[in-house]
Amino acid sequence: MSDEYGPPERIIDAAGTGDEAALERALRPVSLDEYVGQTGVREQLEIFIRAARGRDEPLDHTLLFGPPGLGKTTLANIIATEMGASLRQSSGPVLDRPGDLAAILTNLEPGDVLFIDEIHRLSSVVEEVLYPAMEDFRIDIVIGEGPAARSIKLDLPPFTLVGATTRAGLLTSPLRDRFGIVQRLAYYPVDELTRIVQRSAGRLGVSTEAHGAAEIARRARGTPRVANRLLRRVRDFAEVRADGRITEQVAADAMELLDVDRNGLDEQDRRLLEAVVHKFGGGPVGLDNLATAIGEERGTLEDVVEPYLIQEGYLMRTPRGRVATEHAYTLLGVPGQAAGSGDLFG
C-alpha cells in the first residue's frame, strides 16, 4: 500500500500521497462548472448550494463517500468556494482527542466549511464532541479535574461539516444520521476521464491528441487521480522518447513500459489472477493461501488489489474463497471452466 509521503508502490494505486498533494491542487477544478463527471452529485449539490445561499444559511452537513481518488477532497473545496466560505481541513486519524476537535470548532468563523477526511476513523470520544456541534452548534467542555471538574457549554457559529470516507459502512449510525446530504461518488467512464486528462494536459501545458488522452483514460481504472498520475508519466515518456506530443501510439508505448495494460491491470493484478487460475484451479481459494502463493500481505490483496478486479468482473469473493470468472480466463487466454469447480483451499 502507498506510503503517506512517498510515491505509490503501484502507479495505478488510487490512494494519494503527500508528494502528490501540490500537483493535485494545481489540477483541481475550483467550481461546479469546471467539475467533470458525477453528474447526479454535481446537479444535486448545485441545487442545495444555491438554496442555502438564497436563505443565507450554511449548507447542510454533507457526507461524501466512495473509492479513493474520485474527488471527495476536490468537492469539499468546491463546496467552500461556491458558498463563499473558508475551508478548514483535518482528518479522522489526526483528531485523536476531544480537545483537538474542540480547538478547531471554537476557531471557526460563521459559514466556514470544516472538512474531515477519513471521518470513519474518528474515535468514539471525539464523535461525542461532534454530535452537539453538528445538531445545535455547541460543544460541552469539561474544565478542571476530579471533584472540581465542571462542564460548560460553548456556542459555535453556524458551519458546514463535510465528511469524506472510503468506507461508509464503518460510520456509526448516530454520526451518519446527522448528515443532511449524503452523496456517493462512483468510478468514472472512459469518456469523462478523457475530458479530465485533456483538461489536466492543458493545465500542464502538454500537447495531447484526443486519442492519446483516451488511451490514458482507458487504463486509469475509472479514477481521476490515477489518470492524472499516468498523464504525468506519459508526458515524461513523450518528452524523452517522442517529440513531446502525446498521441495514441506514444501513450500506448508509455503504458507498455509502465506495465499497465489496456484494462488498467498491472503485474500484481495479473499475478493474483494467474495464481487463482493456474495454482488453485480457478478457486475457490482462501485469501491467506492466495497471499502466500504470490508473496503478498493479506491486507494488501484485500484492500488494494482485489477491489478493482472484483468491480471489473475478473474475480468473485464467495463464502468459500476467491473464484476466477470467465472474464479472467479470457484475459489470461485460458479455456474457461465453471466458476468454483476447483478444490477448496483455506
Curated annotation (Swiss-Prot):
<dbReference type="InterPro" id="IPR008824">
    <property type="entry name" value="RuvB-like_N"/>
</dbReference>
<dbReference type="Pfam" id="PF05496">
    <property type="entry name" value="RuvB_N"/>
</dbReference>
<dbReference type="GO" id="GO:0006310">
    <property type="term" value="P:DNA recombination"/>
</dbReference>
<dbReference type="GO" id="GO:0000400">
    <property type="term" value="F:four-way junction DNA binding"/>
</dbReference>
<feature type="binding site">
    <location>
        <position position="74"/>
    </location>
    <ligand>
        <name>ATP</name>
    </ligand>
</feature>
<dbReference type="GO" id="GO:0005524">
    <property type="term" value="F:ATP binding"/>
</dbReference>
<keyword id="KW-0378">Hydrolase</keyword>
<dbReference type="InterPro" id="IPR041445">
    <property type="entry name" value="AAA_lid_4"/>
</dbReference>
<feature type="binding site">
    <location>
        <position position="322"/>
    </location>
    <ligand>
        <name>DNA</name>
    </ligand>
</feature>
<dbReference type="InterPro" id="IPR036390">
    <property type="entry name" value="WH_DNA-bd_sf"/>
</dbReference>
<feature type="binding site">
    <location>
        <position position="73"/>
    </location>
    <ligand>
        <name>Mg(2+)</name>
    </ligand>
</feature>
<dbReference type="Pfam" id="PF17864">
    <property type="entry name" value="AAA_lid_4"/>
</dbReference>
<feature type="binding site">
    <location>
        <position position="188"/>
    </location>
    <ligand>
        <name>ATP</name>
    </ligand>
</feature>
<dbReference type="GO" id="GO:0005737">
    <property type="term" value="C:cytoplasm"/>
</dbReference>
<feature type="binding site">
    <location>
        <position position="298"/>
    </location>
    <ligand>
        <name>DNA</name>
    </ligand>
</feature>
<protein>
    <recommendedName>
        <fullName>Holliday junction branch migration complex subunit RuvB</fullName>
        <ecNumber>3.6.4.-</ecNumber>
    </recommendedName>
</protein>
<comment type="similarity">
    <text>Belongs to the RuvB family.</text>
</comment>
<feature type="binding site">
    <location>
        <position position="178"/>
    </location>
    <ligand>
        <name>ATP</name>
    </ligand>
</feature>
<feature type="binding site">
    <location>
        <position position="225"/>
    </location>
    <ligand>
        <name>ATP</name>
    </ligand>
</feature>
<feature type="binding site">
    <location>
        <position position="73"/>
    </location>
    <ligand>
        <name>ATP</name>
    </ligand>
</feature>
<feature type="region of interest" description="Large ATPase domain (RuvB-L)">
    <location>
        <begin position="1"/>
        <end position="188"/>
    </location>
</feature>
<keyword id="KW-0233">DNA recombination</keyword>
<keyword id="KW-0963">Cytoplasm</keyword>
<dbReference type="InterPro" id="IPR027417">
    <property type="entry name" value="P-loop_NTPase"/>
</dbReference>
<dbReference type="GO" id="GO:0006281">
    <property type="term" value="P:DNA repair"/>
</dbReference>
<keyword id="KW-0067">ATP-binding</keyword>
<dbReference type="InterPro" id="IPR036388">
    <property type="entry name" value="WH-like_DNA-bd_sf"/>
</dbReference>
<feature type="region of interest" description="Head domain (RuvB-H)">
    <location>
        <begin position="262"/>
        <end position="346"/>
    </location>
</feature>
<dbReference type="InterPro" id="IPR004605">
    <property type="entry name" value="DNA_helicase_Holl-junc_RuvB"/>
</dbReference>
<feature type="binding site">
    <location>
        <position position="317"/>
    </location>
    <ligand>
        <name>DNA</name>
    </ligand>
</feature>
<comment type="function">
    <text>The RuvA-RuvB-RuvC complex processes Holliday junction (HJ) DNA during genetic recombination and DNA repair, while the RuvA-RuvB complex plays an important role in the rescue of blocked DNA replication forks via replication fork reversal (RFR). RuvA specifically binds to HJ cruciform DNA, conferring on it an open structure. The RuvB hexamer acts as an ATP-dependent pump, pulling dsDNA into and through the RuvAB complex. RuvB forms 2 homohexamers on either side of HJ DNA bound by 1 or 2 RuvA tetramers; 4 subunits per hexamer contact DNA at a time.</text>
</comment>
<keyword id="KW-0547">Nucleotide-binding</keyword>
<feature type="region of interest" description="Small ATPAse domain (RuvB-S)">
    <location>
        <begin position="189"/>
        <end position="259"/>
    </location>
</feature>
<dbReference type="GO" id="GO:0009378">
    <property type="term" value="F:four-way junction helicase activity"/>
</dbReference>
<dbReference type="GO" id="GO:0048476">
    <property type="term" value="C:Holliday junction resolvase complex"/>
</dbReference>
<dbReference type="GO" id="GO:0016887">
    <property type="term" value="F:ATP hydrolysis activity"/>
</dbReference>
<keyword id="KW-0227">DNA damage</keyword>
<dbReference type="Pfam" id="PF05491">
    <property type="entry name" value="RuvB_C"/>
</dbReference>
<dbReference type="InterPro" id="IPR003593">
    <property type="entry name" value="AAA+_ATPase"/>
</dbReference>
<feature type="binding site">
    <location>
        <position position="69"/>
    </location>
    <ligand>
        <name>ATP</name>
    </ligand>
</feature>
<keyword id="KW-0238">DNA-binding</keyword>
<dbReference type="InterPro" id="IPR008823">
    <property type="entry name" value="RuvB_C"/>
</dbReference>
